[in-house]
Amino acid sequence: MKVLSSLKSAKNRHPDCQIVKRRGRLYVICKSNPRFKAVQR
């Protein structure tokens, strides 16, 4: 999982990527290709 300052590019990496907010942090999750996961602190 990458730690990024901006998730816009991470969201556009794959069509299945989606942004989720959990516990005050923003995450990018990708079910079909999990290597595209990212988090913004």
From Swiss-Prot:
Signal peptide: none annotated. InterPro entries: Ribosomal_bL36, Ribosomal_bL36_sp, Ribosomal_L36_bact. GO terms for cellular component: ribonucleoprotein complex; ribosome. One of its GO terms (biological process) is translation. Keywords: Ribonucleoprotein, Ribosomal protein. One of its GO terms (molecular function) is structural constituent of ribosome. The keyword Ribonucleoprotein applies. Belongs to the bacterial ribosomal protein bL36 family. It comes from the Bacteria. This is Large ribosomal subunit protein bL36B. Transmembrane segments: none annotated. It comes from Vibrio cholerae serotype O1 (strain ATCC 39315 / El Tor Inaba N16961).
